[in-house]
Amino acid sequence: MKVSVLITLAVLGVMFVWASAAELEERGSDQRDSPAWLKSMERIFQSGERECRKMFGGCSVDSDCCAHLGCKPTLKYCAWDGTFGK
């Protein structure tokens, strides 16, 4: 019973890797998409407002932090709140 479960998991893992490789080959390299992704991340962390606290800056409430950052309650620092976009 244990052996059949392990074999099933191994087959599923191989199928996942195979499907991922086929999709990557079909779609092409991610290197073309990387610069756009990096520029969008730069816009998130280099916002025009400089009145706010940057990443890992001290804070007391969420409004102290820049966009897409939130004040962590335990150590009182600005960290990413998990959002993207404007």
Curated annotation (Swiss-Prot):
Q: Which GO terms describe its molecular function?
A: ion channel inhibitor activity; potassium channel regulator activity; sodium channel regulator activity; toxin activity
Task: Write out the tissue specificity statement of the associated record.
Answer: Expressed by the venom gland.
Q: Which residues form the propeptide?
A: 22-50
SUPFAM superfamilies in the cross-refs:
omega toxin-like
Assigned GO CC terms: extracellular region
Q: Does the keyword rRNA-binding apply?
A: no
- Which of the residues bear the PTM Phenylalanine amide? 84
Taking the record's annotation, the residue ranges forming a coiled coil are none
What start and end residues bound the annotated signal peptide? 1-21
Q: Kindly list the cysteine pairs connected by disulfide bridges.
A: 52-66, 59-71, 65-78
Region span, Involved in active face: 55-56
Q: Name one Pfam family in it.
A: Toxin_12
What family does the Swiss-Prot or TrEMBL record give for this protein? Belongs to the neurotoxin 10 (Hwtx-1) family. 28 (Jztx-11) subfamily.
Q: Give the protein's function.
A: This toxin acts as a voltage-dependent gating-modifier. It inhibits the sodium conductance (IC(50)=124 nM) and slows the fast inactivation (EC(50)=1180 nM) of Nav1.5/SCN5A. It significantly shifts the activation to more depolarized voltages and decreases the deactivation of Nav1.5 currents upon extreme depolarization, but only slightly affects voltage-dependence of steady-state inactivation. In addition, this toxin causes an approximately five-fold decrease in the rate of recovery from inactivation and an approximately 1.9-fold reduction in the closed-state inactivation rate.
Comment field (misc): Negative results: does not show effect on Kv1.1/KCNA1, Kv1.2/KCNA2, Kv1.3/KCNA3, Kv1.4/KCNA4, Kv3.1/KCNC1 (all expressed in oocytes), voltage-gated sodium channels (Nav1/SCN) (from DRG neurons), and in a range of voltage-gated calcium channels (expressed in rat DRG neurons). Does not show significant toxic symptoms when injected into mice and into cockroaches.
- Comment block on domains: The presence of a 'disulfide through disulfide knot' structurally defines this protein as a knottin.
Provide the protein name: Kappa-theraphotoxin-Cg1a 1
